């Protein structure tokens, strides 16, 4: 239909400038340059690049991009031709092919419309839904096949729970060891006092030796705490810095991923709209005026895909490094814990083995039960006070028969 009008329809460029240019591409072994073409007669006055495939001559060269208009092939104009005819023209050329183009100077911000933002929000909501739930709510579900980062994220959450549990358990363990060391210290102080006050030399030496053993155990406990405490610092660094940093990177990755999926969905909707109108014989205004809106979305999709690929690569590398650190760090920390506790128990066993002083012989009769001339009778302070109160409150009575001091024969004498 545009052949009859000689393409005199004014193009609606939406304020997007174009810059002409040309590029020479060396074809690959399959005689391809790695682009797909859209537009052309009979509904669109221009032909444009829909997609540049990865690892192809066009992608490696980087000159042309999605949305750029193709104006000629090897100096031959393609005006009024269909996309199939232009594809054949490119295929007929062997070796190098020169593509003449009009570079679309598009700003990605122009493509970030409210529709794209709403699509990103919808993708966030649908991401964690099952297929059945999404279908029941009437929501289309655009997903990336074989997206292993979803499983990696689940593994990261499990690793975070593991480190959190290890941190709490280690804190409780250190607290228990600290209280145990204080108990050993108290034991040592008590036995040391007993040893100092014990009149029997052998028993005194035994109590002091047993006290020193408990004080040594207390020192072993403090040494254990100083050795294991850095383990908490390392675990907290991994738990509170490395994992949150990876989560933040994953959130950025998901944002780029949802943006890319939103542009893909937008392109699909615009394609369906165009096919429906063509089927009805009513071409769209945007198509008949150069399809610049569609080409802008194509450019935005390509740039979003590039950001998505780069971000995905960065996330995979970071998670790989995090996994390696997790494997190495967890082994090192557990070895430190086990070796430190083993040394602690071995040292405690060695000290207590050398301090095997039981049974201890103590002359209780000599120390607490024997009464002699030079020993004072044991009296309780409270009983003395009661006796004084009684003596003050009662009248004087005959003291005959009252208990007197012990004589040399050990018998009581009258006063």
From Swiss-Prot:
Membrane topology qualifier: Peripheral membrane protein; Lipid-anchor
Give the protein name, as stated in the record: PRKCA-binding protein
- PTM annotation: Phosphorylation at Thr-82 appears to inhibit the interaction with AMPA receptors.
Q: Which keywords has UniProt assigned to this entry?
A: Actin-binding, Calcium, Cytoplasm, Cytoskeleton, Lipoprotein, Membrane, Metal-binding, Palmitate, Phosphoprotein, Synapse, Synaptosome, Zinc
Q: Lipidation annotated as S-palmitoyl cysteine: which positions?
A: 413
Please give the organism. Pongo abelii (Sumatran orangutan)
Q: Taking every annotated instance into account, which residue ranges of this chain make up the domain AH?
A: 144-357
- UniProt modified residues of type Phosphothreonine: 82
Recorded GO molecular functions are: actin filament binding; Arp2/3 complex binding; metal ion binding; phospholipid binding; protein domain specific binding; protein kinase C binding
Domain of life (superkingdom)? Eukaryota
Region entry Disordered, spans: 376-415
Q: What is known of its domains?
A: The AH domain mediates binding to F-actin. The unoccupied PDZ domain is probably involved in allosteric modulation by forming an intramolecular bridge with the AH domain leading to a 'closed' formation. Binding of a PDZ ligand, such as GRIA2, allows enhanced interactions with F-actin and the Arp2/3 complex thus enhanced inhibition of actin polymerization.
Name any GO cellular component annotation: cytoskeleton
Q: What PANTHER family does this protein's entry cite?
A: ARFAPTIN-RELATED, PRKCA-BINDING PROTEIN
Q: Where in the cell is it found?
A: Cytoplasm, Perinuclear region; Membrane; Postsynaptic density; Synapse, Synaptosome
Kindly report the protein's main subcellular placement as a broad class. cytoplasm
Q: Which Gene3D superfamilies match?
A: 2.30.42.10, Arfaptin homology (AH) domain/BAR domain
Q: Gene name, please?
A: PICK1
Q: Which biological process terms from the Gene Ontology are attached to this UniProt entry? A: cellular response to decreased oxygen levels; cellular response to glucose starvation; dendritic spine maintenance; dendritic spine organization; glial cell development; intracellular protein transport; long-term synaptic depression; negative regulation of Arp2/3 complex-mediated actin nucleation
């Amino acid at each position: 239909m545009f052949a009859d009008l000689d393409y005199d329809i004014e193009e609606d460029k939406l304020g997007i400038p174009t810059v002409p240019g040309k590029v020479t591409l060396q074809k690959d072994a399959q005689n391809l340059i790695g682009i797909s073409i859209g537009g052309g007669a009979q509904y669109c006055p221009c032909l444009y690049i829909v997609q540049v495939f990865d690892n192809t001559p066009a992608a490696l060269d980087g000159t042309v991009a999605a949305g750029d208009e193709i104006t000629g092939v090897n100096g031959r104009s393609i005006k009024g031709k269909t996309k199939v005819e232009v594809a054949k023209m490119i295929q007929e050329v062997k070796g190098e092919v020169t593509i003449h183009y009009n570079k679309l100077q598009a700003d990605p911000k122009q493509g970030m419309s409210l529709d794209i933002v709403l699509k990103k929000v919808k993708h966030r909501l649908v991401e964690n839904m099952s297929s059945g739930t999404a279908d029941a709510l009437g929501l289309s579900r655009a997903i990336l096949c074989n997206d292993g980062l979803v499983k990696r994220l689940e593994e990261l959450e499990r690793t975070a729970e593991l480190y959190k549990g290890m941190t709490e358990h280690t804190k409780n363990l250190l607290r228990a060891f600290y209280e145990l060391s204080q108990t050993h210290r108290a034991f040592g102080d008590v036995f040391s006092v007993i040893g100092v006050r014990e009149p029997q030399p052998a028993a005194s030496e035994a109590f002091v030796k047993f006290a020193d053993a408990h004080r040594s155990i207390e020192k072993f406990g403090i040494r254990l705490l100083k050795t294991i405490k850095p383990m908490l610092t390392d675990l907290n660094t991994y738990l509170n810095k490395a994992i949150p940093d990876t989560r933040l990177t994953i959130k950025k990755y998901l944002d780029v991923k949802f943006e890319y999926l939103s542009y893909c969905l937008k392109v699909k909707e615009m394609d369906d709209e165009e096919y429906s109108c063509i089927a009805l014989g009513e071409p769209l205004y945007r198509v008949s005026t150069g399809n610049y809106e569609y080409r802008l979305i194509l450019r935005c999709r390509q740039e979003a895909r590039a950001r998505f690929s780069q971000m995905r690569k960065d996330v995979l590398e970071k998670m790989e490094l995090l996994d390696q650190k997790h494997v190495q760090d967890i082994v090192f920390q557990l070895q430190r814990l086990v070796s430190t506790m083993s040394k602690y128990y071995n040292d405690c066993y060695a000290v207590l083995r050398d301090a095997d002083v039981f049974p201890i012989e103590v002359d209780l009769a000599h120390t607490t039960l024997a009464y002699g001339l030079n020993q004072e009778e044991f009296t309780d302070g409270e009983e003395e006070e009661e006796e004084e109160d009684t003596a003050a409150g009662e009248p004087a009575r005959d003291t005959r028969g009252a208990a007197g001091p012990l004589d040399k024969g050990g018998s009581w004498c009258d006063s």
